[in-house]
C-alpha cells in the first residue's frame, strides 16, 4: 500500500525537479541587480530614518523622560539662582 502511494509522489517530485525554476523564481541577471541597488539602498535608508525618528519621538514622549527633563531643568535653575545670590 505504501509503495502504491509513494511511487506517484516520487514521480511528481522528480518531474518538478527536472522542470527547473518557474520564470518568476528565476534569478535576475547581475546587471539588473546592480541597476536596482541604489534604489533599494535609498529605500532602506529612508525606512531606517523613519523608524529611528519614530523611536526617538517615542522616547521623548515617555513620562519618565519628561519628568527627568523637568527635574534637571528645575535643578539647574535653582543652582543658577543660588550662584546669582551668592556672588551678587
From Swiss-Prot:
This protein's UniProt keywords: Lipid transport, Secreted, Signal, Transport, VLDL
What residue ranges carry the coiled-coil annotation? none
Molecular function (GO) terms listed?
fatty acid binding; lipase inhibitor activity; phospholipase inhibitor activity
Q: Which Pfam families match?
A: ApoC-I (PF04691)
Its GO CC terms? Answer: high-density lipoprotein particle; very-low-density lipoprotein particle
Q: Does the keyword Transport apply?
A: yes
The GO annotation for biological process reads: cholesterol efflux; cholesterol metabolic process; chylomicron remnant clearance; lipoprotein metabolic process; negative regulation of cholesterol transport; negative regulation of fatty acid biosynthetic process; negative regulation of lipid catabolic process; negative regulation of lipid metabolic process
Tell me the leader sequence span: 1-26
Predominant location category: secreted
Cited InterPro entries: ApoC-1_sf, ApoC-I
Enumerate the subcellular locations listed in this protein's record, separating them with semicolons. Answer: Secreted
The family assignment reads:
Belongs to the apolipoprotein C1 family.
Chain's role: Inhibitor of lipoprotein binding to the low density lipoprotein (LDL) receptor, LDL receptor-related protein, and very low density lipoprotein (VLDL) receptor. Associates with high density lipoproteins (HDL) and the triacylglycerol-rich lipoproteins in the plasma and makes up about 10% of the protein of the VLDL and 2% of that of HDL. Appears to interfere directly with fatty acid uptake and is also the major plasma inhibitor of cholesteryl ester transfer protein (CETP). Binds free fatty acids and reduces their intracellular esterification.
Tell me the protein's name: Apolipoprotein C-I
